[in-house]
């Protein structure tokens, strides 16, 4: 599976710039307590 506009909530890795770029738009890290280094894409400012 890949990061794409068709998978807006697809998990992304917040540990590197390359990984963030792979998310397509922007990667937001999960709040503390969730998977370390994990995140999700944000589209149009919406989570």
Swiss-Prot record:
Motif Cell attachment site in this chain: 32-34
Compartments, record wording: Secreted
One annotated GO molecular function: toxin activity
Keywords: Cell adhesion impairing toxin, Disulfide bond, Hemostasis impairing toxin, Platelet aggregation inhibiting toxin, Secreted, Toxin
Tissue expression from the record: Expressed in salivary glands.
GO CC annotation: extracellular region
Processing and modification events after translation: Contains 2 disulfide bonds.
Function description: Potently inhibits platelet aggregation induced by ADP (IC(50)=157 nM, complete inhibition at 514 nM). Also inhibits platelet aggregation induced by collagen and by the thrombin receptor peptide SFLLRNP. Is a potent antagonist of the fibrinogen receptor glycoprotein IIb-IIIa (ITGA2B/ITGB3) and the vitronectin receptor alpha-v/beta-3 (ITGAV/ITGB3).
Name recorded for this polypeptide: Variabilin
